[in-house]
Amino acid sequence: MASILDGRAELKAIIDQIAEVTGYLWQKGWAERNGGNITVNVTEYMDDECKAMKAIAPVKQIGMVLPLLKGKYFYCKGTGKRMRDLAKFPMQNGSIIRICDNCASYEVIADEPVVPTSELPTHLALQNYLLETGSCYKATLHTHPIELVAMSHIQRFLKGDEMTRVLWSMIPETLAFAPLGIGIVPYAMPSSVELAEATLEQIKTHDVVLWEKHGTVAVGTDIMDAFDQTDVLCKAANIYMCARSMGSEPDGMTSEQMKEVQDAFNLPKKRPC
C-alpha cells in the first residue's frame, strides 16, 4: 500500500523519530495501554501533491476556532492506539491531518482513517499559540511519567514554584536542560476545555507542564526535544524519591549553587525561540 512517506525522506525522518520516542515512552512505563498523545506540525514537509490529497475520513470538529492553524498539517497519534504499536507502525496508529479553512475542523489525509487523540483540542491550542508567538517549536507530547505524577499527589509540590525548586536542586543537569522548570495545572477533567485553557496559560512560561494526578505536557523543537525535557525532570524526581526512601529529606543544591550554574551556563529565563 502506498504511503505519504514514500519518496519524502524528510517527512519520513520526522515520523521515524516519533516512532523512536514512543518506544522510549513504552520502555519507561510512561505509556500504559493507550496512554499519552503526540502531535507534531509537519506543514513544512507537505509538497503540492500532499496538499492536493483528499480527505479519507469525515470532517471532524475541533471544538474551538484556532486562526493560526488554517491549512496546517499535523501528525497525530490515534485515539485508543498504543505507543508500543505506534513505535512499530506509526502510520497505522496515527495519521496526518489538515486543518480546514474555517480553522475549527480538520480532515484526515493519510495514510489510514485513524481518528486523532481525544486530547487533540489541547494539543492544537498549544500549536496555535506556538505559531502566534513565532516559536520554532513544532511538537507537543503528553505522557505519564511515574515519579512526576506521584509528586503531584502531594500538595506541597503543587504550590508556587516548589516542585521546580526541588527538581532543579537534585542535579545540575536539571537546571541546565530544563531551565524553565515545570508548570503546574490543578486537576481538571481529561480532554476538557478547562484543562486546555489552564495548560495554555502555563505553557506561556514553561516548556513542561504537570497535570495534577494525571501526567505531563511538553513542547519542543521536535518530539525528541519534548521527550528529553520531560525525561530530565523525571530523573530529578527519581533522585528525590530515592533519597527520601533512605529516610531523610534530601538536602539538594543550595540557592547559591543553583545560581552559580545559571550564571555559568547563561541559562535562558524564557523560551529560546
Whereabouts are the PLM-identified features?
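Glycine-rich flexible loops
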Residues: 1-273
